[in-house]
Amino acid sequence: TXIVIIGGGPGGYEAA
């Protein structure tokens, strides 16, 4: 839930 963005660049982590 929610939106969590860690790194935001190549090799980063994004969960919506």
Curated annotation (Swiss-Prot):
Q: Which cofactor does it need?
A: FAD; Mg(2+)
Is the keyword Oxidoreductase assigned to this protein?
yes
In which domain of life is the source organism classified? Answer: Bacteria
User: Which reaction is catalysed here?
Assistant: 2 reduced [2Fe-2S]-[ferredoxin] + NAD(+) + H(+) = 2 oxidized [2Fe-2S]-[ferredoxin] + NADH
Annotated keywords: FAD, Flavoprotein, Magnesium, NAD, Oxidoreductase
Q: What is its EC number?
A: 1.18.1.3
Q: Transmembrane residues, as ranges?
A: none
Under the GO molecular function aspect, what terms does this record hold? ferredoxin-NAD+ reductase activity
The protein depicted here goes by the name Ferredoxin--NAD(+) reductase
What is the source species? Streptomyces griseus
